Amino acid sequence: VYSGLYGIPSTGLRFFTVYGPWGRPDMAPMLFAGAIREGRPIKVFNHGNLSRDFTYIDDIIEGMVRVIGKAPAPTQDRPIPAEVYNIGCGHPVQLMNFIHTLEQALGKNAQLQMMPMQQGDVYTTYADTTKLERDFGYRPQVSLAEGIAIFAQWYEKQQTTGNND
C-alpha cells in the first residue's frame, strides 16, 4: 500500500522450505534430524506423499543479495514501484526423498510413523523462480544431497560438542 500511495519502491521475497545450519528448530529439517538422531518416530503426513521445494540457506542468501541493490522502478505497464520474487530451487522434492537423504547423511535410519493428510495442508509447494532468474540471473547452486550433507555435519557437531560455529 505504501509503495502505491507514496511511490516508495518495495520488494517482497518469498522463501520456500529453507534448511541448513542454524535453521528454525520448529521446522521439519531440524525436527527430523533430532528424531533420527534420538531414535524417535517422525510423523510423516499423507503417508509421505507430499512434496516441498527444499532450499538450502546459501541459495536463499544468494537470491537476497542479488535483489538488495536494485529497487523496482515504476514503468508504464506497472506504475507502482513494487515487485515480489520467489526464492527457492524451483522444483518439488518428495518428502520421503528428503527423509532418506537425511538418513544417509546422519548414518542412521528414521523411525517413520505414517499419518493421514493434515487438514489444511497442501500436497505440493514449489517456487516459480522464472522472474528472479530473468531479472537477476538467479539459479540455485546447492543440490539436496550437498545441502543435507552440510546440514547434517553441522547438526552432529552441535549435538556432540555444543559448538556454536
Where do the model's predicted regions map?
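C-terminal substrate-binding subdomain of Rossmann-fold SDR/epimerase-dehydratase oxidoreductases
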Residues: 34-165
